[in-house]
Amino acid sequence: MNISYDDLGFFHRLGADGIRLDLGFDGRKEALLTFNPYHLAIELNMSNDVAYLENILTHQANTSFLYGCHNFYPQEGTALPYHFFQSSSERFKKNGIRTAAFITSQSGTIGPWDINDGLPTLEMHRHLSVETAAKHLFATNLIDDIIIGNAYASEEELKSLGHLDRYQTVFRIEFVANVNEVERQIVLEEQHVRRGDITDQVIRSTEVRKKYQKDENKVHDTEFEFVVGDVVVGNDRFGKYKNELQIVLEPHSDPRKNKVGHITPEELILLPFIHPWSKFKFIEK
């Protein structure tokens, strides 16, 4: 094709916005590419946890045109584990490089290879809904852009991504039959903030109890052990803690708390990303 890294005019004439370097060169060449006169973005492969990026940056790359994107993995069992994804992504984020990763449509059947078991970056996402996988990537604060790897995503999948709040986690909750109107309001209509002095047992949203301190909350759904992902609200037995909302992180029992619902099981992977002072909300499944 007679193409050289010294002249990217071929890609410009194609109408491309950028090029991906899956393997790369020696660092100096990549840095020079970021100064191409066509302002084409130069995208690096993020799925290698080595000092490749640092080498490019030592050659004074133009980081305004330098991007990072992970690979996708069509074969079941071959995508990245989370700890490796985290380490390799942090290399880019700490240097202010824009990042991207892939999620997989559960309805798409078309990919670039003859094997297509989905096209995620993370193996843990392979059988998750696009909504939950995207929530997880945004919750890590490591990924700026999300790409659906396979075609074609369903209208429902696209709509769910279109309504996604990328700036805070919104949990889907299934309510128990006995949930009352005050509890529904506390769960669905309030902005929740995890208390800053955290505990291992629960995620506490304490400000809501002040707003609802005068509202009655009769006892219900207290006679069993709460499990991880249960959402509980303090009942009339709980004194000053009445109507405080909590998400259960460790199994325990407490008759002063009503179970009002449970976070959708596949979204339990989001709980570790609710840090001190993190904001979060709920929607009904």
What function would you assign to each model-found segment?
Residues 24-27, 55-59, 100-104, 197-205:
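Short low-complexity stretches enriched in small and charged residues
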Residues 6-7, 17, 22, 26, ...:
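Acidic-enriched, low-complexity/disordered segments with a strong bias for Aspartate over Glutamate
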Residues 176-285:
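C-terminal functional modules
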Residues 12, 70, 83, 125-127, ...:
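Histidine (H) residue identity feature
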Residues 15, 39-41, 71-72, 116-120, ...:
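N-terminal start-of-chain detector that recognizes signal peptides
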